[in-house]
Design a protein with these regions (language model features):
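Nucleic-acid endo/exonuclease domains
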Residues: 1-85
Length: 85
């Protein structure tokens, strides 16, 4: 399956890192008809994390609870946390 990420950050045409904004549906099953669909969502999220890990691509995951905190300093801090993965 094709893995889609919310944002890709490039510098000089080189991928620097990926960003995933994770809404509430990534944490609680109430957005889904069945538990199985929720578990598929979690599997898809884990596939993205594993892809980035295997390909040494830094992945910033922003939980919906941080929505009002997002600014350039927030992103820089998150990048510093993941850049050497």
């Amino acid at each position: 399956n094709l893995l889609r990420f919310d944002f890709a950050i490039f510098e000089n045409e080189k991928l620097v890192y990926l960003i995933e904004y994770q809404g509430e549906q990534h944490y609680t099953p109430y957005h889904f008809d069945t538990q199985e669909k929720f578990e598929k969502r979690l599997e898809y999220d884990n596939a993205k994390k594993e892809y980035c890990k295997q390909n040494r691509i830094p992945l910033i995951i922003i939980p919906y609870t941080d929505f009002n905190k997002i600014d350039i300093q927030y992103l820089n801090k998150k990048y510093q946390e993941v850049k050497n993965i």
